[in-house]
Amino acid sequence: MFSSDELRENYLKFFEEKGHKRIASSSLIPHNDPTLLLTTAGMVQFKPYYLGVAKPENPRMASCQKCFRTTDIESVGDASHLTMFEMLGNFSIGNYFKKEAIAWAWEYVTQRLNIPAERLWITVYLDDDEAIALWKEQGVPENRIVRLGAADNFWGPAGDSGPCGPCSEIHYDFGQETGCGKADCNPSCKCGRFCEIWNLVFVQFNQDKSGKRQNLPAPSIDTGMGLERLTILMQSKKNVYETDIFAPIVEKACLLSGRKYGCDAATDRALRIVSEHSRGITFLIADGVIPDKAGRGYVLRRLLRRAVLFGRRLGLERPFLVDMAGAVINRMSGIYPELKKRQTYVLEMIASEEARFSETLATGLELLEEIVRQTKGGRISGQDAFKLYDTYGFPVEMTTEIAAEKGLSVDLDGFESEMEIQRTKARSSRKFSFDAAATAEAVKNMRHAEKTCFVGYELAIQKSTIKDILTEGGTVDSIEEGDEASIVLDESPFYAEMGGQVGDTGEIITDAGRFEVKNTLHLPNGVFLHQGRVINGCLKISEAATAHINEERRRDIARNHTATHILQTALREVLGEQVQQRGSVVTPDRLRFDFSHLKPMSKDEMRRVEEFVNDKIRRNLPVYAEEMPYRHALEEGVTALFGEKYGDRVRVLRVGRPAVSAELCGGTHVTASGEIALFKIMSESSVGAGLRRIEAVTGREAEAFINLQQDSLSELSGMLESTAEESPRKLAELKEEIDTLKKAVQNLERQMSRGEAEELLSKAEDYKGVKLLVSRMTSVNADTLRETADFLRDKLGSGVIVLGTVTEDKPFFLCMVTPDLIAKGYHAGNIVKKLSQIAGGGGGGKPNMAQGGGRDKSKLDEALQAVKGMI
């Protein structure tokens, strides 16, 4: 019996013998291919070869590729569906075609794997007579060759565009005793009798985004055989979880949960989900995916949270996914060494994300149960689904899955409406300077909708023509002094806000007027809006104008933008290749860069990043841009942002020869890195789970920042009467002395309050059969007040204690109720809530202890006097 590792090696060796070059698996994150969410097939890394934009070292290649598909996540848990899998494949780039592909496939399955030929059926595309003839040459009888349509036997593209073509599949027949039992049953039947084991794709076309197909430069071959499915067959197992691929991982899940696999369907399903998703998230994180609200990160978050949910159903209340990931790494790192190399990072990321979700899971499940109880009409509202998503971190797919188990559906349209409301709010800070709805209406009626020609890469001043003028009221023919408006030019040197870079400012001048441009916006139709106000005179539509940007401001922006590119390279150099850009803002004053990283950067890491960037600045590296076909840029390894939409031609910005940085970028930059002058990090902070932010300055702003720090240090040194070098030590000594004095003061306060508390005991009175102690205390903080109340409660044994004080110039209340009186209905939280309301504030708490405050300290005594009315 073959092990899965032996099958993998056996396949690759077979095709090496056929002249193929063994190629290592690429990452699950497609290399510079924003058209794909994740790597879905073995041919993804070879797309440039199929498209003819690059040439492989050897036109024959074979690989075992990590793949990930997201279409059936909710189905994972049955016996067949997987998210992450390994795809065995052999590939020809214009070298061999159908004849060799079919002959070698048949040879491998019948001679190397020794699968009986009579157990194998073939499917082909409807009109592929050539393939049918070639299968017959291998000895396959015509009655075991089935013609099927495009849904079954036309493959690709992998994404919304790319190589594709008809295909032919090899199916294994489990026999008539399996499945429907019909005499005419064939691989098109879904009864379970047949299992597809190998797909041979005859790559002939390139399909564009509109669905149009063109012939490729040379017909090629792309085959795919799922290792997991093949292993099931070769090890005679019922499903993949019983094979040696998953058995150790399932065993770990059983060990952690105390459950046994194979006892009942619900337990088996949960064990499969935990095991499969643990494998998937381990590989995703190792390849650089981080949890997020969108894109690849959302897929990862869905899997991780679904695994946690089903872990709870197995009784796993404590974090367990780190242990599961460890089992995955132990099983798979021999084949994929990156798992061991990035083990610490992977486990830290999983621990962090699992802990975050665990904090809200229990409360979220309680809320969901309540929603289920109250739901009428069999449908959970979009509002409720959104609350579970936004507040408790429940992916809507998870809510839908749980609801389905209860016989309910979810209003997904309503959920999407709530999401759009949230997105609109998030965009509100970026709206036009005048009413967005009015602007949208004006844009719709714009008289000039042709794209603005941007000339700002080369020019700071440009002769132009005013094509349109927009105001809050719509389009107008002219504007006068003091009017606020947006001007549309046919040609403009102004960079419009895009890609994180702010828009240019400057002036638009005509013979009759001067317009101050305060911002430049880029509309979806490619038109630039030059927003601002008329300084003097008037401006009219169709007038000749001179557009002049603020050149000094542009140079400052360029320094920061180029520095941002070098910074990204520096972060990957210092922190690791898993670092990904998550956002950036480039202004004249500073730059802001958000990136994926689990923990705060150390001082040493920040220093090394600064040193890297400043070294590249001192080298005065050339900074240059060139336009090229998008596909060529990807082949050259240029960094592209996932989710960004790029045209057929792109602008590549490089720093250095050879390039230190190469990114797709439409922004403005310096011509040599030396123009940046100086780079200085101002701060490094967290902006979310697994997300860090660096704010930095360059040039004059960096000098000003350093001078400010030096001035502050000099002032501090003077106050401490020490040198700059000695100041940190002296400040630490001073802080230690202050902490010691604070503790002494607190001890003294406790002694005084204890004495005061002894006196307060005498003020306790019987009121309606209850011991009641109400008092105002002076010169105590909230902590001391709580200690005093604890002392009084213990001394009284039974009673209600209400204390008040003024702390930080605001009233503060604390109430304690002994257990015997709680049983009689007395509630500390209710009492404090009423007291706080009298003082203009709020508060509450548990029946035994509660605290709260107000805004009006003059109401403190009035509130305390009202206590008896609350008893």
Swiss-Prot record:
SUPFAM superfamilies membership: Class II aaRS and biotin synthetases, Putative anticodon-binding domain of alanyl-tRNA synthetase (AlaRS), ThrRS/AlaRS common domain, Translation proteins
GO cellular component: cytosol
Cofactor(s) it depends on: Zn(2+)
UniProt keyword Ribonucleoprotein, yes or no: no
SMART domains tied to this protein: tRNA_SAD (SM00863)
UniProt binding sites for Zn(2+): 561, 565, 665, 669
First-tier enzyme category under EC: ligase
GO molecular function, one term: tRNA binding
Principal cellular location given in the protein's record: cytoplasm
UniProt cofactor note: Binds 1 zinc ion per subunit.
GO biological process, one term: alanyl-tRNA aminoacylation
This protein's record includes keyword RNA-binding: yes
Pfam families assigned to the protein according to its UniProt record, in alphabetical order: DHHA1 (PF02272), tRNA-synt_2c (PF01411), tRNA_SAD (PF07973)
Keyword field: Aminoacyl-tRNA synthetase, ATP-binding, Cytoplasm, Ligase, Metal-binding, Nucleotide-binding, Protein biosynthesis, RNA-binding, tRNA-binding, Zinc
Its biological purpose: Catalyzes the attachment of alanine to tRNA(Ala) in a two-step reaction: alanine is first activated by ATP to form Ala-AMP and then transferred to the acceptor end of tRNA(Ala). Also edits incorrectly charged Ser-tRNA(Ala) and Gly-tRNA(Ala) via its editing domain.
Domain comment as written in the entry: Consists of three domains; the N-terminal catalytic domain, the editing domain and the C-terminal C-Ala domain. The editing domain removes incorrectly charged amino acids, while the C-Ala domain, along with tRNA(Ala), serves as a bridge to cooperatively bring together the editing and aminoacylation centers thus stimulating deacylation of misacylated tRNAs.
Protein name: Alanine--tRNA ligase
Lineage: Bacteria, Bacillati, Chloroflexota, Dehalococcoidia, Dehalococcoidales
